[in-house]
């Protein structure tokens, strides 16, 4: 999750 959105 590189953007801390659960990606």
UniProtKB/Swiss-Prot annotation:
Q: Where are the transmembrane segments?
A: none
- Give the protein's recorded name: Carcinustatin-3
Q: Where does the UniProt annotation locate this protein?
A: Secreted
What job does the chain carry out? Answer: May act as a neurotransmitter or neuromodulator.
Q: What is the residue range of the signal peptide feature?
A: none
Family of the protein in this entry: Belongs to the allatostatin family.
Its keywords, alphabetically, are: Amidation, Neuropeptide, Secreted
Positions of modified residues (Leucine amide) = 7
Query: What is a single cellular component term in the Gene Ontology annotation?
Result: extracellular region
Q: Name one GO biological process term.
A: neuropeptide signaling pathway
- Which organism is this entry from? Carcinus maenas (Common shore crab)
Top-rank taxon: Eukaryota
